């Protein structure tokens, strides 16, 4: 393995930087959903981007607002990015397939229910003004599961910093 500071040949270096910028966009989207931060979610998209999320097809801006509203019913959510295949097609265009798993915790029938979503995002990206972002996303459903939660893990969870679904949650600002 070459040293971390070894220079890659021109095009390979540009592709590696582009792929990392695209991955960061995917992470901003997920973090924004989990923190109910539409602005952070929207930063993953370019102006005028579109999104087909099955239950909603339209502008990315409208999707982000809708997601924040709809996710308020959950006690907590966690959107996880898994495999992220990216193909850089030229200096300003790329496509990607992002595997994702989402955990959604909600109150149900006097207890708590964990809903789990497995899916993929099929993305088209563009680089505009030296910024890579999504211009079109299709959300593909693979499968889902819903199950009642039993007792919590036998750990002293109250001793940990507790997460929240907003900008005030521990770790949001690095503190």
Q: What residues fall within each predicted segment?
A:
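Hydrophobic/basic alpha-helical segments enriched in Actinobacteria
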Residues: 21-22, 39-40, 59, 87, ...
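Short beta-strand segments enriched in hydrophobic/aromatic residues
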Residues: 33, 45, 100-102, 138-141
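A solvent-exposed, acidic/Ser-Thr-rich amphipathic alpha-helical stretch
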Residues: 38-104
């Amino acid at each position: 393995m070459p040293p971390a500071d070894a220079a890659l040949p021109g095009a390979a270096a540009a592709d590696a930087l582009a792929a990392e910028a695209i991955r960061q966009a995917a992470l901003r989207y997920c973090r924004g959903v989990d923190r109910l931060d539409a602005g952070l979610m929207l930063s993953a998209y370019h102006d005028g981007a579109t999104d087909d999320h099955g239950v909603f097809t339209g502008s990315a801006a409208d999707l982000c607002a809708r997601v924040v509203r709809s996710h308020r019913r959950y006690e907590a959510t966690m959107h996880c990015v898994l495999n992220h295949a990216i193909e850089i097609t030229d200096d300003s265009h790329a496509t990607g397939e992002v595997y994702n798993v989402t955990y959604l915790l909600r109150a149900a029938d006097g207890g708590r229910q964990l809903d789990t979503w497995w899916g993929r995002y099929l993305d088209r990206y563009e680089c505009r003004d030296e910024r890579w972002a999504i211009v079109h996303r299709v959300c593909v459903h693979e499968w889902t599961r819903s199950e009642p939660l039993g007792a919590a893990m036998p750990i002293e969870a109250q001793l940990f910093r507790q997460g929240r679904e907003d900008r005030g949650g521990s770790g949001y600002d690095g503190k």
